[in-house]
């Protein structure tokens, strides 16, 4: 029984395309390697949409430095209680959950690019609400607006990039949003050393302006245009993305055939479609990756970094520690972007879960020993543990769940499934951030980190059993892998489009 399951698992993790159509597609996509310049416009598109991720990172980490100055009685113009502070920290993921739900229909009806673009002005308004706040209610409104935009953007970015970027660079360019997100975290931590919460919010208000300008330079995805019957616009968009001299006829033809086949399949209710035989596995994998991403405890760590270092009694300055953590986060994600298309998604997920598991148990053990004896001489352990933990997260479970959401969800359900996955991710984020301090109160910091470490160990097993390798495969090949073997006569017809990631 165990041997049989192992065989089935191993075979499910190797994407074996049907020779007829997949070999043609694989050859087609490998031909683009002749000229690196063919990726220039795809890089520009990735950079433009990644500015939204910079805002996501800045918004996510804002509470860590801001709450310190908000609760400073010597400078505060109104009181921020402990309970209010918890809501300021947790209202953003709760609002992001709503944004994730609404973002799904938006990317289908108004397009991927327009959905991303529509977050710019609300982001600006949210930060101005916070910066000009005269009471806690205004801060909560501002955080809610920013959180809503975070949910919409985190859903739309993987969709846009998955549909716009070629397979051989999809891993590297697909991780750019995570690199930018970590840049936002680093920017917020660094600025937080010198700026009080109001000025920190004003700095956040500057980012959407740059983002707005860049988004006007890039096109909508060709797959969305084709789904709306706009073939001329799709050709123009694909030509822009692939370069003026690129021959796009074969790729455009394959996308059209995928769309025709998806339209041919009988349509049921959107949510019912999620449970079709060839849809349920990619949806389950995407939800599983989102669950383990958040229950690794990353957002509890990011939201409460300063507080964690204070509680640990570390001899290292907590503000300096947050900057070091943010810098390591940025560098390690950048390295991951450079190697993901060489090592593959699964290898980075293995490395990620092992590093996080070891460091979470180390961190928990430090807090446990701290209650029994003086650990002043070991004050460097929290910082080192957190650094290695962040490296592990940034290598795998940080960026890859969002990247794979844009790769494995079938075109037929991509908008709906991406919406469900994003809402689920932010639901988990809300649960983790809202219950973190309660967990610390009831089972202690050591119990909390041991719990996160145990869940990461389960994540390692989940990757082994369930997650397929998608490196170097076109979206069409990945979708057919989940659909199962096809007859020779329908190999080309079974190509399906690809509309869609935190």
UniProtKB/Swiss-Prot annotation:
The keyword Cell membrane applies. GO terms for biological process: trehalose transport. Residues 1-38, 105-120, 166-172, 221-282, 341-346, 398-410, 468-502 are cytoplasmic. Keywords: Cell membrane, Glycoprotein, Membrane, Sugar transport, Transmembrane, Transmembrane helix, Transport. It is a multi-pass membrane protein. This is Facilitated trehalose transporter Tret1. It is found in: Cell membrane. The lineage of its organism: Eukaryota, Metazoa, Ecdysozoa, Arthropoda, Hexapoda. Glycans are attached at residues 73, 319.
